[in-house]
Amino acid sequence: MIRRICLKTLVLFVVFNVLFAFIAPQSWLGRASLYNLVFPGRPRLPWGENPDRAYNLTLNNLDAMFAAHEIAASPKPADEFRVVLIGDSSTWGFLLRPEETLSAQLNAMQLKAKDSRRVRVYNLGYPDFSLSKDTLIMQRAMGYQPDLVVWLVTLRSFPISTQMHPLVQANQTDPAPTDRWFWSQRRNLADLLRLQLYGVPWATTGIDQVYSADYVRWQNDLDPDDTFQTLKPPTLNRADLALDVIGQAKQIAGTTPLLIVNEPMAIATGKNSDIRYNFFYPRWAYDQYRVLMTEQAQQKNWRYVDLWNAIPAAEFFCWACPVMSTRYWS
C-alpha cells in the first residue's frame, strides 16, 4: 500500500514538473506586476544584497525586472526622446540614491532633442561587470523603443571570464530540461512574489539599497602589483577580451543609435601610481585596452567616446561611485 502511494506520488511529481516545463509560465508570471499599477515603477532594475533592509532583491526573471521598472509604466509618449543607459554598478548607482544617479542627473537638466522632443533617460544599468550581461539587458530594452542607447563600459567588463554572468546563465535560450521543472524554479518563483511584497515598503520609503557608511573607500596608495586579474604584462591581446560582444550589441540595436562610452574612473596619484591607475587597473593593461577600443571603433564605425579621465579623483567616494554632478555630464 505504502509502495503504491509512493509510486503514485512520484508519477504525479514527474507529470506536474513536465507540464510546468511545457507551459513555462515564468514569463507571463514575471509580467504580472503590481508595479506601475499599484506601486510606482522603480527608477532602476531590481537588485539587492539585503532585501529585508533595502526592500529590493536580486532575481533572474527579466520580465519581472522590466515590469517593475518605470520604463514599463505606459507606452512611449509621442513627445519623448527615449534614452536608455546600459552599464554596470556605477550606472545603476551603487551607494547612490536614485536622484544622484547619472540618469537622474541627466533628466534634471531637462534636455531637448533637435526635434524639440523632451529627452527622458532611463537607468537600465545592472551591477557587476559583463558585456554579455549588458547585451542581454539591451536586447530586452529594445522592446521599449529607445531612440538612443548609451552603453557605459570599462575594462573589467571585457575579459572572457566575466561573460557568464549569473543573469546570463539564468536566461539561456536552451536550458537543460530539468532546469525548467517547477522543482528547479522554486526559488525564482518565490522571488517573483517577494519582489511584489517589497513594493509596499519601497513605495512608502523610497529605499532600494542599504547606504552603509562601512564601505571600502578608494585608495590613493596602491600595491606594487602589475597584474590585471590573471593577465600579466607586457601585452593585452585582443583574444583576452570579448570585443565581439560589442558587434552583437550593434546588431541588436539595429537602426537605433548606440553610443559606447568608456566610463570615467578614479586615477590615483599616490604610492605605486606609476604602476597602477587604481586598485583595478595596472597602467599597461588599461592603456592597451584604450588603444584597442579606439582602433576597433575606427575600424568598425562605432559611435565611441573615451571619458576615462573626465572626472577628478576627488569626485569618487568609492571606486565605482563617482558623484554624477551635472557639471561633468553637461
Regions found by a protein language model. Give the residues of each.
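Serine-dependent acyl-ester chemistry module
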Residues: 157-294, 307-315
